[in-house]
Regions:
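C-terminal peripheral helix-coil segments that are non-catalytic and often amphipathic
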Residues: 2, 87, 91, 98, ...
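Short amphipathic alpha-helix in the helical subdomain of ABC transporter nucleotide-binding domains
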Residues: 8, 132, 154-159, 181, ...
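Helix-turn-helix
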Residues: 14, 18-56, 60
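Solvent-exposed, amphipathic alpha-helical segments
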Residues: 18-25, 71-76, 161, 165-169
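Helix-loop segment at the mouth of the active site in Rossmann-fold oxidoreductases
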Residues: 31, 152-153
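Hydrophobic alpha-helical connector segments
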Residues: 60, 73-103, 158-159
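Short, basic, alpha-helical segments at the C-terminal edge of helix-turn-helix-like DNA-binding modules
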Residues: 62-70
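Amphipathic alpha-helical packing segments from all-alpha helical-bundle domains
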Residues: 70, 99-110, 117-146, 155-160
Length: 206
């Protein structure tokens, strides 16, 4: 436990991490201000110095994780021509699919105040699924220009299909612990890229 008056670096991230661990371990019923600060090793009042309450913490946690994935996606167009298209898409798909644990995602959707905060932030321009989708589309356009995708590939639709399906998986299937996010991402990318690369995930990639 950190003593009063002693600065703790990256307090918000510590609180986010603590909340994620509690949600994964105990579910929403275990998420209290005291439980979070205890898990994070912070003073009891630390949470309310950074957030108005649990709803704001959950909303900011989700927005922070989305922003992190969006920053990763922003780098994709600059990596066109590197590795393989499949590998690059699997990396970003896996990052998005693992950005939130299922309980956190479910709580964000089912808590009206948190859901409203997230929606308002995204509408105001906070990076989220739309930004990730646009970065993927830009990346696919760059790969098409290099001949690593079929010329007729609808890159916008392909990006939408990838992000939309991962969003669905993120929100609906992670309660099943038998599911492997890496396998899910690989199967999805293989299916989506098949028609654009002659039916083989590596075919035609130079």
């Amino acid at each position: 436990m950190s003593p009063r008056g002693v600065a703790i670096p990256d307090v918000r991230e510590r609180l986010f991490g603590a909340a994620e661990r509690i949600l994964a371990r105990e579910g929403p019923s275990g998420l209290t201000s005291r439980a979070i600060t205890t898990e994070a090793g912070c003073a009891k009042g630390m949470l309310h110095k950074h957030f108005a309450g649990l709803d704001e913490l959950v909303a900011e946690l989700v927005l922070t994780r989305f922003a992190s994935t969006a920053r990763l996606a922003e780098d994709l167009p600059g990596r066109a021509g590197e590795s393989t298209v499949a590998a690059n898409l699997k990396t970003i798909g896996y990052a998005l699919l693992t950005s939130l644990n299922p309980t956190t995602a479910g709580l964000a959707v089912s808590t009206p105040a948190a859901s409203l905060r997230i929606r308002e932030a995204l509408e105001a321009g906070a990076p989220g699924f739309d930004a990730i989708q646009q970065s993927i589309a830009d990346y696919l356009d760059a790969e098409a220009e290099r001949g690593r995708l079929a010329p007729a590939t609808d890159t916008t639709a392909l990006a939408l299909a990838l992000v939309g399906t991962v969003h669905h998986l993120l929100m609906t299937t992670w309660g099943d612990t038998a599911r492997d996010p890496g396998e899910q991402t690989e199967r999805l990318v293989t299916m989506l890229l098949g028609p654009t690369t002659g039916g083989s995930i590596g075919h035609g990639e130079r």
